[in-house]
A protein has these predicted regions:
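His/Glu-based metal-binding/catalytic segments typifying zinc-dependent metallopeptidases
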Residues: 74-131
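Generic alpha-helical structural context detector
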Residues: 6-7, 123-127, 136, 223
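Charge-rich, well-structured scaffold segments of protease-associated domains
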Residues: 1-74, 110, 118, 140-268
Length: 268
């Protein structure tokens, strides 16, 4: 369901929507892998991150082992924002299965966008953690699914916001209706203060782990570099979480989510 969702949102010819097939994989040979490595990894965009107790001896060993590798100029890349996307709504794909996997999504902002921090909070309230609205209402209170969450995937050129859930075939319509109801409520009604404070505490606590030890620090820096944002953006995100008010969460959601444009995929 995820593969179909990304294809329908971004388009089958878009790198974020392209899906490989068995035939594609079988046709790949060693020369193809080597060429891909040279064009996309062995370039001037490549970097090495070293953290911890780094001595001059360690730096010299890194230089001795990697400094001789010839890097090619990074090729001109197509700005993926300019690639035409296939946004034709596809409501469902039916297979003979007793269980159904549901994905409901829309293309969204990247980490470079001003709305990212607000969407980070919006997603958490809706379905980004165990005490989220989707989980509390649809899983815990109504028992319509055994697994539901929302997530905001971000890439260098854009992002993807989607809701994922699994349920029995006879509960799909009822569950999806409730999903849209919860989205509507979050877009239209202020978040209670206690709920927003709970989300703040959860997110700030979670982000602390991003700097817990050298390995987590390296991973945090790596993700910033790959997605085209400064390391200071993490502190900006923390500041936004600590100060954002319910009105801003609602307004950010309205700018980036439209129920009429959501694409729904049902497998099973």
């Amino acid at each position: 369901s995820y593969r179909i969702l990304t294809e329908k949102i971004f388009g089958s010819n878009h790198p974020y929507g392209y899906n490989s097939t068995e035939q594609n994989i079988r046709s790949v040979g060693t020369p193809d892998i080597l060429s891909h490595w040279q064009l996309n990894y062995q370039t001037t965009d490549s970097f090495i991150i070293v953290a911890g107790n780094v001595t001059n001896t360690i730096l010299q060993k890194i230089e001795d082992n990697f400094g001789h590798i010839g890097l090619k100029k990074t090729p001109t890349r197509t700005d993926l924002k300019d690639i035409e996307r296939d946004m034709r709504p596809i409501k469902s794909f039916k297979l003979e299965k007793t269980q159904s996997s549901v994905k409901i999504g829309i293309d969204c902002v990247s980490r470079q966008h001003d709305d990212f921090d607000g969407m980070f909070v919006f997603n958490t309230v809706l379905g980004g953690y165990f005490n989220s609205r989707l989980n509390n209402v649809i899983r815990e209170a109504k028992g319509l699914t055994y697994n539901i969450f929302s997530t905001h995937d971000t890439y260098l050129y854009g992002g993807l916001f989607y809701i994922s859930a699994d349920t029995s075939q006879d509960q799909v319509i009822k569950m999806n209706t409730e999903i849209y109801t919860q989205i509507d409520k979050l877009l239209d009604k202020p978040i209670p203060k206690a709920e927003l404070e709970r989300v703040r505490g959860y997110l700030l606590g979670t982000l602390m782990t991003s700097f817990d030890g050298v390995y987590n620090c390296v991973e945090t820096l790596r993700s910033c570099l790959i997605e085209g944002v400064d390391f200071a953006s993490v502190q900006q995100l923390i500041n936004k979480i600590a100060t954002i008010e319910t009105t801003e969460v609602m307004e950010t959601g309205r700018r980036n989510l439209s129920i009429d444009n959501l694409i729904e995929v049902v497998i099973g």
